[in-house]
Amino acid sequence: MSDSFYRYDVIVIGGGHAGTEAALAAARAGARTLLLTHNIETVGAMSCNPAIGGIGKGHLVKEIDALGGAMAKAADLAGIQWRTLNASKGPAVRATRCQADRNLYRSAIRRIVEAQPNLTVFQAAVDDLIIHNGAAEGDSVRGVITQTGLRFEATAVVLTAGTFLAGKIHVGETQYAAGRMGDPPATTLAARLRERPFAIDRLKTGTPPRIDGRTLDYTMMDEQPGDDPLPVMSFMGQVSDHPTQVSCWITHTTEQTHDIIRGALHRSPLYSGQIEGIGPRYCPSIEDKVVRFADKTSHQIFVEPEGLDVTEIYPNGISTSLPFDVQLALVRSIRGFAQAHITRPGYAIEYDFFDPRGLKASLETKAVGGLFFAGQINGTTGYEEAAAQGLLAGLNAARQAQALPAWSPRRDEAYLGVLVDDLITHGTTEPYRMFTSRAEYRLQLREDNADLRLTGVGRAMGLVDDARWARFSSKQEAVQRETARLSALWATPGNALGREVVDTLGVPMSRETNVLDLIKRPELSYAALMRVPTLGPGVDDAQVAEQVEIGVKYAGYLNRQRDEIARQQRHETTPIPEGFDYAGVRGLSMEVQQKLERVRPQSIGQAQRIPGMTPAAISLLLVHLERARRSQVA
């Protein structure tokens, strides 16, 4: 093999949702990239729930897509049941979710990975990092060493190990080392990382038992069909991309289920002290639900198909690590599950994660230059959160290899910006999940405008290909053209257009009104307006029509939010130099100094969001930074 086989710009460790997006982003950005995975067959595998999107999560998927990522495209090719959540609410909180055929999804991701120029995939477990100990410039990564002793060199390395770092599975009293059921853990790599100056702790997550769908009685459940018309996830997607559609089903636990669980809590690793890691608050185990909500006589379960060509179903809502005999009893006590056959047991898994306050906004570690972390190892939960971090880390790894400045979106620019800022500023003690409520500027950060917010940025950094750019540019021009067309038209009580509006829509017309302003009326929409003969038929692209309508209906709110953002941005990006001496700022309390030393914020904006930070402390920092700037100029 030639030396070039062992030398890359960027190496990505792990082929899950974070790893694939990281490798694809680095390669799209022009870096020669190597993706190392312990098993090529599991690249893009959905380890837990076979679904993509949801509240907050769908927003991240749209942002990944707007930046040229793969997740939305794969979801469109694999989604077998589609829903728009919060459809009756405002556009800021509407979210797309699909039930996915896990085999179709994995195959789609693998095809995308294998077709990507600049990207090489190699099957190998990584046991160690090659770290250069620089006396002056600090530690920096130089490559990796595999389980078989191969050494691959790179300028930047992205670690996306998921639950594999010292992973330990629990089923009742039984526990054993694993990355997920059926896969070995990264034990040696975890031990090597613990020798480095990283703050490491343990988290846990879990998954429910899988069931043979042929053994269920669906007559005892409520059918949950998908939406009609079907949504799409990718801005490049079409409904024709979707495979055959199927329904999900809803059932409930019973009082017998809860009695079985209560009677076996002493055998639960969650309650016996066997599991030390903290689990996800918003995806609790069925044991947790029964204990925490003791007054409830039943809990809802979503019966979700795993795919079109398999019989397994995913019972969403009964994640458990109880012993198998208890799992079988509790499953068979659920409505419609009396004859259920379990195909795989549920389990909990504990794993190492790193305090994300040890990361820069680029997701590069502060301790080791050129080393980036993404995904569950940063304390998050969920495919979407992992994939979004992967894209950002992969992009910035490529930019570092090319000696370009790092990029990270602000909180007002993307949910990805909210996610990263929350992690690196506040850290986390439990698996972090994205919600729309975490974003203070969510009216600006909608699913529908993710491309308008990010595709231009992605194009400038090499993430967006010509086809996506052409589609985006065409859409942007169409929105501007249609908005201009309607804004040039006026309806009055006495002119022909005004009479058409009154006759067609049945709305009163007492004064001259701009046609665009008609859309601001709660009872009117763009589609309704296009029924007026002179105005219709309008644009046939639903995305364009949606942008025209939202831009008009919410103009006042959006303008106010932009003004608020402008005020906030005054000092948001004021940089704080690396290695800044907080002890040298006179007037800072010891408590504030300790908080600042712990987080080491990169900007005044980040410093402002540290819990317990006071306006007075920020003022002192600004004064000190300004003095330092003036002294340098002088």
UniProtKB/Swiss-Prot annotation:
An annotated GO cellular component: cytosol
Tell me a Gene Ontology molecular-function term this record carries.
Answer: flavin adenine dinucleotide binding
Q: Provide the binding site for FAD.
A: G14, G15, G16, H17, A18, G19
**Which Pfam family, giving just one, matches this sequence?**
GIDA
Which cell locations does it reside in?
Cytoplasm
| UniProt-listed GO biological process terms | tRNA methylation; tRNA wobble uridine modification
Where does this protein chiefly localize?
cytoplasm
Looking at the keywords, is Iron-sulfur present?
no
- The domain of life is Bacteria
Q: Which UniProt keywords apply?
A: Cytoplasm, FAD, Flavoprotein, NAD, tRNA processing
Binding residue positions for NAD(+): 279-293
**What family is this?**
Belongs to the MnmG family.
Write down what this protein is called: tRNA uridine 5-carboxymethylaminomethyl modification enzyme MnmG
Source organism (scientific name): Xanthomonas campestris pv. campestris (strain ATCC 33913 / DSM 3586 / NCPPB 528 / LMG 568 / P 25)
Designated gene of the protein: mnmG
